[in-house]
Amino acid sequence: LAENDQVGALVFDEVDTGAPVEQMEFEEVDYWDELTKIMDWTNTHVTSTMFLCWGAQASLYHFYGLKKRMLPEKKFGLFWHKVNNRKIPLVRGFDDEFLAPHSRHTEVPIDDIRACKDVTILAESDEAGFYLGMAEEGRKIFVMGHPEYDRMTLDGEYHRDKDKGLPIEIPKNYYKNDDPNTKPVLLWRSHANNLYTNWLNYYVYQVTPYNLDGTPDFSGK
C-alpha cells in the first residue's frame, strides 16, 4: 500500500463508508483529524465522493456543521423511500418508492438537512428520515443507508447482537413473516445497482476532466 504522502499526489474515485463509532462524538474518534484531512483532500483530488452512513454523517458535520443525534432505538431493517426530484440524474430509473437497508443508532435530522441550502435531498423515508442527497452538483453524494449490503448482512448483524445479549429487534421488512430462521428476501439489489451505476456514469466518468495521458486533471476546479 502507498504511504500517505504518496497517496496525496494521486487522484481517485472515492467511497467513504461507515464505521462502528457512531455513538461517539466525532472529535472523540481516534482518526478524526486524519479523516477530516482526507475529506478536505477530496475537494481537489476526487471528481465525486460518495459518503455512506456514518461517513455521510461525518461529512455533513465536517463540511456543513450538521450534527447527528441519538435515536431512541436502532434504525434497523428495510425501509420505504420516495424520490423527491426526478430531474436529477442520480435518481434516474428509480421506482417511485423503493426499499433500502438502514442499520444505525444515530441520524442527522432531515429538517436540519433541509435547512442547509448547500445540500439537495433526493430521497427520504417517512420512517427512516434522510436517505440520499448531494452537494456541489454531485461532487459530494450522501447516502444515509446501506445499499451496498448483501442479502445476509442484516441477518449477520441481528444474530451477532442477539448472541451478545444486546437489545436488538428483528430487522423490519427483511425476513418473510418476520421469521429470523428463514432466508432473508433480497428486495434492494436493483435499487443499489441503479444508484451506483448512475453515480459512476453521470458523476464520475462523464465529468472527470482528463489530460491527454489519461490522468484526471483538476487544475480548473
List each language-model region with its residue ranges.
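Cysteine-nucleophile active-site neighborhood
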Residues: 12-85
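Amide-donor transfer/coupling interface in amidating biosynthetic enzymes
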Residues: 2-6, 76-221
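A basic- and aromatic-enriched beta-loop-alpha substructure that forms the phosphate/nucleotide-
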Residues: 1-2, 24
